[in-house]
C-alpha cells in the first residue's frame, strides 16, 4: 500500500501548520510568562521577534489563556 505523493504533501503541510499555529505559540506563551520580568534587553528584543513571527498562532490561542496575576492574600 503506497502512500500517494499528494497525501504525503498534504500531511506535511498539515503538520507544519499545526506546528506554526498551535505548538510553537504555546511554547512562546510559556517562555514569555516565565521570563517577561527578568529578561535583558537583548532577550526582550528576541521576545518581540517571537511575538511578531508567531502572531497568528498567538492570536488563535489568546482567548484560551489567562495570564492575569493571582490575587494576593492580605493578612491583617
Swiss-Prot record:
Summary of the function given for this chain in its UniProt record:
NDH-1 shuttles electrons from an unknown electron donor, via FMN and iron-sulfur (Fe-S) centers, to quinones in the respiratory and/or the photosynthetic chain. The immediate electron acceptor for the enzyme in this species is believed to be plastoquinone. Couples the redox reaction to proton translocation, and thus conserves the redox energy in a proton gradient. Cyanobacterial NDH-1 also plays a role in inorganic carbon-concentration.
**Cysteine pairs bridged by disulfides in the record:** none
Domain of life where this protein originates: Bacteria
The identity of this protein, by name, is NAD(P)H-quinone oxidoreductase subunit L
Ordered alphabetically, the record's keywords are:
Membrane, NAD, NADP, Plastoquinone, Quinone, Thylakoid, Translocase, Transmembrane, Transmembrane helix, Transport
Report the locations given in the UniProt record. Answer: Cellular thylakoid membrane
Which EC main class describes this enzyme? Answer: translocase
InterPro entries per UniProt: NADH-quinone_OxRdatse_su_L
Amino acid at each position: 500500500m503506497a502512500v500517494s505523493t499528494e497525501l504525503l504533501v498534504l500531511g506535511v503541510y498539515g503538520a507544519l501548520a499545526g506546528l506554526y499555529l498551535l505548538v510553537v505559540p504555546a511554547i512562546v506563551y510559556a517562555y514569555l510568562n516565565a521570563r517577561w520580568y527578568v529578561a535583558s534587553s537583548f532577550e526582550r528584543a528576541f521576545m518581540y521577534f517571537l511575538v511578531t513571527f508567531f502572531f497568528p498562532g498567538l492570536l488563535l490561542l489568546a482567548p484560551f489563556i489567562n495570564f492575569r496575576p493571582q490575587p494576593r492574600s492580605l493578612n491583617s
